[in-house]
């Protein structure tokens, strides 16, 4: 298996006041998290959140005085190395690591630091990014704070928090906006910071049926973000597709916010594809298709300053160049135009 003998690392992000610490504090009380270590990054020098997670104080580390997405990444790497060393010496159980970012963090540089480090990549894998979005203030955060949008774009799962102080109509409107920003994300809700521990069951692939039913009506956002989901009816040549994707990210990596999907390469099971900006997670090979009703490739792209038609034209041109032209069923979601 791809992740055998590796420790999952979950990134929990979300804008300031979105309820990250409250949610973690409640979840970590479950006995199934007894072997979980937590790293909490706070922007200021005097940290507080780590003191709120008292249940696992001996396994909670504070990284303060800066954000791990920029000037504190070396501290994050050093802390993960220390955890690994302690675990190998038998001093620390390490079933999972959870990193809670600051409210101003962009998850992409954090992913880059972990996925490109020669030691960490052999001992840790990022199983998912969870983003919290405050139901009471989430719409304003998305409108006024680019960091909030980046957190949603990078997320595999988005949790709408504080639904206990928001109306169902507000929550539903926010859900629709999240779907339009990141069609690949799975969305949950939390009242009083309470969620099931199943939120840590990593999502694998986007729900194409849901994507097909989305209406692109949201969006009073004056932004240049576009999203698209495409479906291939025939197996893809994995080597050729990988070359095309690498070329695309090399040229447009900073503008390609998210690539996520499940790819049929003609084998017994699919390949799970997951990338943020120019960083692609190591592809995960699944043993079979038992969790999917249909056997086909489904891929979501979220990008800035790039029209969906440009991506499709580029892929079609490359497929034509190598003499492989699988049937493509495109779904263009362009809520921000």
State the predicted function of each range.
Residues 29, 36-37, 51, 89, ...:
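A generic "cationic amphipathic patch" detector
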């Amino acid at each position: 298996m791809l992740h055998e003998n590796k420790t999952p690392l979950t990134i929990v992000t979300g804008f300031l006041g979105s309820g990250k610490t409250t949610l973690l504090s409640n979840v970590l009380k479950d006995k199934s998290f007894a072997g979980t270590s937590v790293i909490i990054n706070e922007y200021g020098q005097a940290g507080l959140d780590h003191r709120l997670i008292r249940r696992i104080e001996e396994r909670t580390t504070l990284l303060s005085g800066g954000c791990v997405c920029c000037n504190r990444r070396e501290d994050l790497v050093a802390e993960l190395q220390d955890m690994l060393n302690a675990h190998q010496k038998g001093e620390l159980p390490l079933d999972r690591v959870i990193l809670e970012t600051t409210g101003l963090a962009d998850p992409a540089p954090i992913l880059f630091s972990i996925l490109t480090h020669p030691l960490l990549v052999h001992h840790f894998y990022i199983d998912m990014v969870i983003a919290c979005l405050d139901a009471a203030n989430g719409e304003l955060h998305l409108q006024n704070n680019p960091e909030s949008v980046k957190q949603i774009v990078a997320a595999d799962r988005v949790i709408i928090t504080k639904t206990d102080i928001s109306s169902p109509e507000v929550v539903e409107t926010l859900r629709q906006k999240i779907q339009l920003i990141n069609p690949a994300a799975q969305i949950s809700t939390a009242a009083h910071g309470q969620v099931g521990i199943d939120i840590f069951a990593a999502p694998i692939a986007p729900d194409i049926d849901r994507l097909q039913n989305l209406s692109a009506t949201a969006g009073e956002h004056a932004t240049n973000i576009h999203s698209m989901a495409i479906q291939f009816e025939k197996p893809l040549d994995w080597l050729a597709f990988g070359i095309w994707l690498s070329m695309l990210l090399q040229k447009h990596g900073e503008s390609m916010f998210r690539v996520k999907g499940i790819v049929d390469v003609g084998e017994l099971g699919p390949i799970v594809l997951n990338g943020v900006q120019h960083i692609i997670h190591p592809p995960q090979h699944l043993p079979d298709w038992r969790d999917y009703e249909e056997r086909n490739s489904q891929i979501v792209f979220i990008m800035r300053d790039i029209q969906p038609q440009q991506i499709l034209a580029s892929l079609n041109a490359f497929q034509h160049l190598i003499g492989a032209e699988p049937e493509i069923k495109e779904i263009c979601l362009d809520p921000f135009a």
